[in-house]
């Protein structure tokens, strides 16, 4: 009888441990990645740095029986890396803007209230269309699906800071920061480390070719595509294009196109536009 009780006890304990590993640990890991905080980074986050980041919102127009309707997604991310007068050039992911021929992409800058905030504080009703009409539309400059990267341009009367691109890929375990727009949350900061010692071949669900990337553990989610990955010098070391999630949709890792490949992509962009 005692032997049987021992076996049952071992089985129950094992089952509990398995359940903890499957259900509890991934949730704790996601929480840690989302709430991790690097004080030395946070001191360098100025309004200028934040203003270099943008929300890229897809606007689709549909006409049915002479009735025109518009729809907007939650938005993705992008970062300014170059400028000419009041024209600014931003990096984002190719899959964010791949429908450029059939849709418009609206640029929402840092510091602007969301539609819900705008509506709540307005004395008169404002439609979605009225809200989005106040923002600039992006122009596609260059895109390459083999990198899952794109360059877009937009106008801004406000002077924006141009963030430099780092020359060398980040090292394994190097500290990083991501500024992105996960699930509609605007300009969210997440912190982490580079998890790759070499290139990781990432295959997305967007029917794009495999892309050479680096893994990291700074939190990201849907809407983070195209977002910037910064080092301690506030240099661009990567652009996020996706990541891994478990069967319960919990964060496992992010993937970014590292800066050496970004520079390679921009060389092609310059050649294409000369």
Q: What are these model-predicted stretches?
A:
Residues 83-145, 242, 252:
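Catalytic-histidine neighborhood of serine endopeptidases
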Residues 40-42, 61-93, 136, 226, ...:
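A conserved glycine-rich beta-strand in the N-terminal activation segment of trypsin-fold
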Residues 49-53, 71-76, 85-87, 91, ...:
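Extracytoplasmic
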Residues 53-57, 77-81, 89-93, 107, ...:
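Soluble periplasmic/extracytoplasmic beta-strand elements of cell-envelope proteins
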Residues 51-71, 155-161, 188-273:
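Active-site region of chymotrypsin-like
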Residues 8-11, 20-77:
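Protease-domain processing segments flanking chymotrypsin-fold serine proteases, especially trypsin-like
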Residues 1-15:
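N-terminal Sec-pathway targeting helices
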Residues 130-201, 231-232, 241, 253:
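Serine endopeptidase catalytic core focused on the charge-relay Asp
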